[in-house]
């Protein structure tokens, strides 16, 4: 009798999480494998979908984050269905976190690849990446959506070399009644002039950012990266469009492509559809030319992981020996920091979306986050630490801080007079109370009497602010439980 060998049926590809999966606990549906890094609003993990065996990325967002912005990001991803845009599969509420399940891009971002290899890209590589990126932008712009944060760190590659747009934390929707948006948002060095000037902008603002990204891929960093971002903010609208530092290194086609992107007048700037017909893009080679650089970057990453794991194992060995030598009858309790087996993350602290993201730029260049420049990477590249903060360009924070300082200084120099209202007196934030020595006892007593009502007023304002943030979260959780709202 002939033996028939049964083959396991092929697992289907995950397209979207079904209703049954969404009603389960996420741990029943996924196995979380490792942390990838920190993205806009939350931590990102690599996980496997148990039913299909497909690798996914899960962004875990604390509900105390700006829920409205998170829901907007989910909404935009949910509406998109393009091979050039990172896919959204579904989301869960788990304790105090929102789990957002997205497509996993194993090669990371273009900026990761540049940093890991410590090399910029060739024209052929740039053309291939730009072609896919333009197809993604053409799709978004057709849907009347503006990405608003195009840069190498938000262009992800899968292991086959296909580029996909990611991180829609700052994306915007254009409606029929809103021809242009006026919100200042984005990453300073990549911002279009009209965005900085707040004169209204539309989809072609992304094209300017793409031109800056092309220079970033070619030179390792965008124009003005070596100067303070505050100065760059004023230079971008007033100076001529930026160009390559060494134009002679690049072909006429590539130079012209960048020139078409970096037209200061939005009305005269090329669209994504037009740029797809540009000779530089039309001559782009297939994604296979990206495989070598992807493999090289992944090899570097793997070696770093192995090195980190060896260091962890060595630390644990040393800690274990110290514990054994401590006492003949009692072993020292291992605390939170000593002897703990730390999982060697595949990426360092500065990851964005679902990829490692140590940008090449200094200081506060955050889009959805506020960045710091505490540590330096190899060469000219610096690490960017991302924390979950609402979207606010750093140059706006600079102005706000200056305004606060001016208020404090003017108060310290003012002559004390009758206190008309408790709100007239603001406590200096820098703790400098030297000016009080020049006040009379009567003035000091008036200020002292004003403290109690001022404190009650501040407490009430804080309570109202807390309630305004808390209620939408409670409403969203309740809606999720009733399954009336599926992200």
From Swiss-Prot:
BP terms from Gene Ontology: apoptotic process; hippo signaling; intracellular signal transduction; negative regulation of canonical Wnt signaling pathway; positive regulation of apoptotic process; protein tetramerization; regulation of MAPK cascade
UniProt PTM: Autophosphorylated on serine and threonine residues. Phosphorylation at Thr-387 by PKB/AKT1, leads to inhibition of its: kinase activity, nuclear translocation and autophosphorylation at Thr-183. It also diminishes its cleavage by caspases and its ability to phosphorylate FOXO3. Proteolytically cleaved by caspase-3 during apoptosis at Asp-326 and Asp-349 resulting in a 37 kDa or a 39 kDa subunit respectively. The 39 kDa subunit is further cleaved into the 37 kDa form. Proteolytic cleavage results in kinase activation and nuclear translocation of the truncated form (MST1/N). It is less likely that cleavage at Asp-349 is a prerequisite for activation as this site is not conserved in the murine ortholog.
Record carries keyword Transcription: no
Cofactor: Mg(2+)
UniProt-recorded Gene Ontology molecular function terms: ATP binding; metal ion binding; protein serine kinase activity; protein serine/threonine kinase activity
Modified residue annotations for Phosphothreonine: 3, 183, 340, 367, 387
Positions of the Protein kinase domain: 30-281
PTM-bearing positions, type Phosphotyrosine: 433
Residue stretches of biased makeup (Acidic residues): 313-326
The protein's Enzyme Commission number: 2.7.11.1
Gene3D superfamilies: 1.10.287.4270, p53-like tetramerisation domain, Transferase(Phosphotransferase) domain 1
Region entry Disordered, spans: 303-332
InterPro entries: Kinase-like_dom_sf (IPR011009), Mst1_2_SARAH_domain (IPR024205), p53_tetramer_sf (IPR036674), Prot_kinase_dom (IPR000719), Protein_kinase_ATP_BS (IPR017441), SARAH_dom (IPR011524), STE20/SPS1-PAK (IPR050629)
Active site: 149
Subcellular location: Cytoplasm; Nucleus
N-acetylmethionine modification, residue list: 1
Known catalytic reactions: L-seryl-[protein] + ATP = O-phospho-L-seryl-[protein] + ADP + H(+); L-threonyl-[protein] + ATP = O-phospho-L-threonyl-[protein] + ADP + H(+)
Record-marked site positions (Cleavage): 326-327, 349-350
A GO cellular component annotation in the UniProt record: nucleus
Residues annotated with Phosphoserine modification: 265, 320, 410, 414
Ranges in a coiled coil: 290-310
SUPFAM superfamilies: Protein kinase-like (PK-like) (SSF56112)
Principal location listed in the UniProt entry: cytoplasm
Subunit annotation: Homodimer; mediated via the coiled-coil region. Interacts with NORE1, which inhibits autoactivation. Interacts with and stabilizes SAV1. Interacts with RASSF1. Interacts with FOXO3. Interacts with RASSF2 (via SARAH domain). Interacts with AR, PKB/AKT1, TNNI3 and SIRT1. Interacts with DLG5 (via PDZ domain 3). Interacts with MARK3 and SCRIB in the presence of DLG5.
Similarity comment text for this entry: Belongs to the protein kinase superfamily. STE Ser/Thr protein kinase family. STE20 subfamily.
Record protein name field: Serine/threonine-protein kinase 4
Source organism per UniProt: Macaca mulatta
Highest classification ranks of the organism: Eukaryota, Metazoa, Chordata, Craniata, Vertebrata
